[in-house]
């Protein structure tokens, strides 16, 4: 018989660990953001507000050498650099960044080709290690978009190029053709006044539909959700994985059929229970023997959707003999050099009366980037972190609620059975630190007694969840064949089993979840 239907696994369904959005971002790194705060400084009206920006100008536009009086045929020796150029294009910076050149036009110095709805693109950064006179550009979130950590952040696209800015609306709420994007200009602070101010940096500030679908905040320094300097340091954590699938669906029961369906909850015609006749004795015994030789119920049988609950052994029993971390693990900057400074080329001044003096070497560039000392590096204990991370994800998060606490400034639902509440509660890291270097085999009591099979490393549950697919709303179709699981070493009485003995299969449509039922 067949069972068909559509299943809504609910908003807590999450068939993966971690996050699908900005998963490589540090968990405490903010999105480039703006916020508003009171002005600071002597003689400033404290009631006045000013906008502050924290961001990254990742996109670099190199300017070619177009200065007056420059011989383009002359060459100069550079160390980790390239010829500098004058900032002739800064006068047009108010139009934005020049992303490309329109080769069909003659005057190529005025063609600012950026489309501000999606350019500069956040995934495009520097394409050269050399430092030049350049414009830098990037994107930032306006103060109206409430800050969230970059880890786990998602904003749905609002145009076909992938831009995420909101569409501006009229006073009556009707959408317009314009997007909520403004240009913010920045320059190096000038000593002693407003002279010589030219923007070196342009940020495209926008409001977006910012969401965090599969993460939650676990460190929140400010009580308010609004954008602020304090909320720059929020830290996120992924929501727990939650596989949801049908339990072992079909329970076999052999009973004697006295033609009146005595002892059966429902008759054969009602189809609430599937009652099928056995074959003759030889056929049935041969089929049982075949099934027994093929495998047992700890295998995965997708035909019956009956994968048996099975833990990862490391989850139930902690075998701890320390971590193999004898070798240090280093990481280095991408350019392989680290922090560098710009140096001018010089040479001895051999002019009359200039002994022991030096002069600018006109054959060497003014910008030579040179690093001093060791390459900048950081060390991390990879093995210890992997072990601790495993223990926290697989042991600490599944401990009883009494072992956990609510982070400061985080408000959780009063219903302790909700997915949001379970995710918001965190366990002290010291709970799993205690297992490092014990050198023993531990069977944790909560893992055996508190929902022992509701765990994301339950391979049977995970498999049954995968059979339904990775969507929240899923159509399902379970086909149960006429031949069912055989009972090993079944003792059959003499007689014709075609009419006297039947298997009844109870349709067990109970859902199982990694968070508990």
From Swiss-Prot:
Annotated GO CC locations: host cell; host cell nucleus; T=25 icosahedral viral capsid
Keywords per UniProt: Capsid protein, Cytoplasmic inwards viral transport, Host nucleus, Host-virus interaction, Late protein, Microtubular inwards viral transport, T=25 icosahedral capsid protein, Virion, Virus entry into host cell
Keyword field contains Transmembrane helix: no
Record InterPro entries: Adenovirus_Pll_hexon_N (IPR016107), Adenovirus_Pll_hexon_sub3 (IPR016110), VP_dsDNA_II (IPR016112)
Keyword Lipid metabolism appears in the UniProt entry: no
One Pfam family it belongs to: Adeno_hexon
Localization per Swiss-Prot or TrEMBL: Virion; Host nucleus
Lineage top rank: taxon: Viruses
Gene Ontology biological-process entries: microtubule-dependent intracellular transport of viral material towards nucleus; symbiont entry into host cell
Stretches for region Disordered: 1-48
Inducing or repressing factors: Expressed in the late phase of the viral replicative cycle.
Family affiliation: Belongs to the adenoviridae hexon protein family.
Assembly notes: Homotrimer. Interacts with the capsid vertex protein; this interaction binds the peripentonal hexons to the neighboring penton base. Interacts with the hexon-linking protein; this interaction tethers the hexons surrounding the penton to those situated in the central plate of the facet. Interacts with the hexon-interlacing protein; this interaction lashes the hexons together. Interacts with host dyneins DYNC1LI1 and DYNC1I2; this interaction might be involved in intracellular microtubule-dependent transport of incoming viral capsid.
Function: Major capsid protein that self-associates to form 240 hexon trimers, each in the shape of a hexagon, building most of the pseudo T=25 capsid. Assembled into trimeric units with the help of the chaperone shutoff protein. Transported by pre-protein VI to the nucleus where it associates with other structural proteins to form an empty capsid. Might be involved, through its interaction with host dyneins, in the intracellular microtubule-dependent transport of incoming viral capsid to the nucleus.
Other comment: All late proteins expressed from the major late promoter are produced by alternative splicing and alternative polyadenylation of the same gene giving rise to non-overlapping ORFs. A leader sequence is present in the N-terminus of all these mRNAs and is recognized by the viral shutoff protein to provide expression although conventional translation via ribosome scanning from the cap has been shut off in the host cell.
Name by which UniProt lists this protein: Hexon protein
Lineage: Viruses, Varidnaviria, Bamfordvirae, Preplasmiviricota, Tectiliviricetes
């Amino acid at each position: 018989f067949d069972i068909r239907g559509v299943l809504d696994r609910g908003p807590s369904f999450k068939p993966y660990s971690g996050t699908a959005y900005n998963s490589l971002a540090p968990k405490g790194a903010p999105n480039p953001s703006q916020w508003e705060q009171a002005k600071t400084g002597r003689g400033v009206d404290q009631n006045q507000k000013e906008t502050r920006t924290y961001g990254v100008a990742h996109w670099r536009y190199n300017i070619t050498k177009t200065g007056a009086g420059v011989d383009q045929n002359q060459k100069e020796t550079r160390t980790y650099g390239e010829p500098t150029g004058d900032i002739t294009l800064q006068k047009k910076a108010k139009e934005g960044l020049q992303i490309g050149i329109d080769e069909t036009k003659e005057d190529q110095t005025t063609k600012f080709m950026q489309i501000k709805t999606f350019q500069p693109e956040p995934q495009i950064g520097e394409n050269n290690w050399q430092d030049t006179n350049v414009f830098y550009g990037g994107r930032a979130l306006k103060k109206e978009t409430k800050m969230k950590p970059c880890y786990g952040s998602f904003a749905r696209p609002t145009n076909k190029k992938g831009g995420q800015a909101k569409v501006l609306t009229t006073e009556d709420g009707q959408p317009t053709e314009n997007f909520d994007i403004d240009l913010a200009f920045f320059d190096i602070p000038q000593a002693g006044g407003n002279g010589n101010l030219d923007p070196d940096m342009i940020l495209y500030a926008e409001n977006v539909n910012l969401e965090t679908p599969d993460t939650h905040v676990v460190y929140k320094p400010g009580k308010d959700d609004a954008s602020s300097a304090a909320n720059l340091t929020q830290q996120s954590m992924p929501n727990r994985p939650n596989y949801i699938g049908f339990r072992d669906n079909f329970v076999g029961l052999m009973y004697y059929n006295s033609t009146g369906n005595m002892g059966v909850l429902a008759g054969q015609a009602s189809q609430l229970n599937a009652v099928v006749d056995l074959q003759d004795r030889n056929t049935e015994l041969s089929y049982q023997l075949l099934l027994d030789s093929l495998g047992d119920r700890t295998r995965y049988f997708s035909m019956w959707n009956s994968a048996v609950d099975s833990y990862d052994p490391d989850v139930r029993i902690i075998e701890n003999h320390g971590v193999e971390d004898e070798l240090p693990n280093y990481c280095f900057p991408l350019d392989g050099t680290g922090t560098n400074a710009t140096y001018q080329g010089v040479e001895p001044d051999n002019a009359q009366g200039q002994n022991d003096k030096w002069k600018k070497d006109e054959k060497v560039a003014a910008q030579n980037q040179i690093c001093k000392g060791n390459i900048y590096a950081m060390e991390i204990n990879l093995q210890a972190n992997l072990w601790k991370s495993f223990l926290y994800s697989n042991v600490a998060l599944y401990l009883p609620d009494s072992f956990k606490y609510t982070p400061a400034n985080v408000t959780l639902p009063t219903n302790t059975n909700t997915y949001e509440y379970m995710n918001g509660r965190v366990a002290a890291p010291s709970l799993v630190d205690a297992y490092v270097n014990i050198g023993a085999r531990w069977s944790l009591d909560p893992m055996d007694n508190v929902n022992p099979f509701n765990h994301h490393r339950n391979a049977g549950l995970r498999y049954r969840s995968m059979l339904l697919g990775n969507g929240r709303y899923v159509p399902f179709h379970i086909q149960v064949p006429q031949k069912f699981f055989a009972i090993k070493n079944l003792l059959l009485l003499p007689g014709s089993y075609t009419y006297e003995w039947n298997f009844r299969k109870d349709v067990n449509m109970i859902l199982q979840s990694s968070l508990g039922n």
